[in-house]
């Protein structure tokens, strides 16, 4: 479960918030336009945060990875954006 403090720490200058509750967070990167769905399993072992990703709204999500914390998941997303922008020349 994501805590209120974790959810409030999401950078709204960087992300557009779409859905936010204790178990599910859907955000869009303002840098790349990519969509991210983060799901808290509620279990503390085996990567309790599952990260799903898609490039466009109409595309289906695919699993991008797992994280131990919401903060770690957000860091992974920002690193993905850096890769998209610098290596793939996105935007």
Language-model-detected regions and their locations in the chain:
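Functionally constrained cores in energy, signaling, and assembly domains
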Residues: 14, 39-42, 76, 81
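Hydrophobic beta-strand residues in large extracellular and virion-surface proteins
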Residues: 17, 25-27, 36-38, 50-52, ...
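Mixed-charge, Lys/Arg-enriched low-complexity segments
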Residues: 4-7, 53-91
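Broad hydrophobic/π-residue packing in well-ordered secondary structure
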Residues: 3, 25, 46-50, 67
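Short aromatic-glycine-(Arg/Gly/Cys) micro-motifs in beta-strand/loop hairpins
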Residues: 32-62
């Amino acid at each position: 479960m994501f805590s209120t403090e974790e959810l409030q720490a999401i950078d709204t200058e960087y992300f557009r918030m779409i859905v936010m509750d204790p178990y599910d967070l859907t955000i869009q990167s303002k840098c790349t336009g990519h969509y991210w769905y983060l799901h808290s399993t509620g279990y503390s072992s085996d990567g309790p945060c599952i990260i799903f990703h898609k490039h466009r709204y109409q595309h289906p999500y695919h699993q991008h990875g797992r994280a131990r914390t919401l903060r770690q998941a957000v860091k992974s997303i920002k690193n993905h954006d850096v890769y998209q922008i610098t290596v793939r020349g996105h935007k």
